[in-house]
Structures are given as structure tokens and as C-alpha cells.
Amino acid sequence: MTASERNIQHAIVARLRWHGWMVRELSQPRAVSGELVGVPDVIAFKFGHTLLVEVKRPGGEVRASQRQFALEIEPHGAPTLAHWITSDVDDFARALNYLELMSDIVTVREQE
């Protein structure tokens, strides 16, 4: 993961946590062991909803294993599952706001 991908990922994770999501970062050298190849960098949960986020630097390319993972989970998706590939924090924030609005997910901070 490049420095710019790390910066983007940190900003996305911070945004998710601010919105009350329980977040786990999965990005690590997984290909070495052959396990979890293609699995996104970030997984987040909130009120039964699951988000999978693959972080790319601007202009970064999606690997074949990441495309394959997206194809494999697609038939198992539900309205509560989103799998995003992003390199833009602002676009991600807008998509997250839209998802929460459309899914009636209330941000914890808005309840306080």
C-alpha cells in the first residue's frame, strides 16, 4: 500500500468511525500466505449493515483478485451490503451519507 493509499484509508476509516461504524482494517500483505487474496482493505459494520471498501490511490488499478472477489460476493449481496472501490475521500463521504439516508441508518452523533 502506497503512502497516498494509506492517507486515503486513514481518512475513510476516520469518517466511518465518526459516523458510528465499527471498523476493521484488513490491509496487510495477504498474498504472501495466499489467504484473503482480493479481500478489501476495510470492513465496517453498523446496525446489521456491512461495508467493504477497497482503497486505491488516484489512478491506482484494481487487481484481478479484487475484481474476482467483487464478482464472487455479488450474488450474496443484500441491500445492507456495499462493496466500494475508491480513491476519493469526498466521493466516499457522499456515498456513505446517501447509503445511510437510503437505509435509514442513523448516525450515532446525530442521536446525541
Q: What role is predicted for each listed range?
A:
Residues 1-112:
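Catalytic phosphate/metal-binding cores of nucleic-acid and nucleotide-processing enzymes, i.e., regions
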